[in-house]
Amino acid sequence: MKKTVLLLFGGASSEYAVSCVSAACVADNINKELYQVCLLGITADGKWYLYSGDTDSMRDLSWVNKEEYLTPAVISPSKTHQGVLLEDGTVIHVDAVFPVLHGKNGEDGTMQGLLALSGIPYVGCNTYSSAVCMDKVTTKILCEKVGIPVVPYAYFRKNGFDVQKAVEECEQKLSYPMFVKPANAGSSVGITKANNRDELVKGFEVAFDNDYKVLVETGISSAREIEVAMLGNKDAVASVCGEIAPGADFYDYETKYVSDTASYYVPARISDTLSDTIRACAEKIYRTLDCAGLSRVDFFLDENDVLYFNEINTIPGFTPISMYPGLMGKCGYSYSALIEKLIENACEEKL
């Protein structure tokens, strides 16, 4: 008998569009002989609909205008339902949820908390680790405690923020160029590069427009971005290393999803010894942050091959250009087999 799998997509997040494309790819590639797929879309302004239309409309974001395919619905927080609740009281039982949601309100523990209440097995990290991993500052603090190397940094909160004092602190602790980042935004949203004091001040403005907490890091000279995909629960495995050459000043949202100027190398152009070191570091980070299901762990590698942990993504992208499925593909997982493994892991973790 087929299991009913609910794919969540969209969301009130700056990464709404990426989520819609990722979910469309998952829906197209999931094994229909094993799973009955239901699509639950969340609009950018937070409305929830069961969606029965085509995936192309998800990709071009027009799904929200296809009223004939939209039925208001929510995930019931009641374990007696374990499914989707329609306005008329009808309950659609769900065996597993794949929250293909990126960024705030989807990847930060909020949705995971609802799913935990519902009693439905779901793909990915639990509420705690999702929340921790979303916060770049908290992640760095925890990883530093276990000896993971991180880029020199400082952080600030919007409440009581004094830009002059912040600039002075950054210039004392760090060096230009600096990168100014919202602590709780994904896909490089709101990140700016500051080569001087004026750009640092502007960077604070941009970052605080996206979050209440801001992280500032020293830029790493001639840095290469190395990524490792993690798959599994207690027996999690690390993929081969992948490398990103941005083709721009840095790997921002525009480079990732719009301009298509980045180059990707899988496996990365590094020695086997260095690859093993990075993969072991990714495994340590995954365990330290109590992750499960999947994550993508991102590093910087400087011109002397010194390694720095950058960040971790608990629901990485599943678009055609996303690194996570590409990295797992090099480990022998087709896109369809990867989805199946993720769902199996979700149900296993629930047992």
Enumerate the language-model features and the residues they cover.
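ATP-binding N-terminal substructure of ATP-dependent carboxylate-amine bond-forming enzymes
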Residues: 1-128, 132-134, 138, 157-166, ...
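Active-site nucleotide/adenylate-binding loops and adjacent lid/helix of ATP-dependent enzymes
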Residues: 2-9, 13-14, 20-24, 28, ...
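Hydrophobic beta-strand scaffold residues
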Residues: 37, 121-122, 150, 178, ...
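Glycine-rich phosphate/pyrophosphate-binding beta-alpha loops
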Residues: 102-103, 188, 244-247, 313-327
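Phosphate-binding site of ATP-dependent enzymes
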Residues: 195-280, 301-308
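Conserved metal-phosphate-binding beta-hairpin within the catalytic cores
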Residues: 218-220, 228-230, 286-318, 328
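Active-site "cap" helix and flanking loop/linker of ATP-utilizing ligase/carboxylase catalytic domains
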Residues: 243-295, 326-351
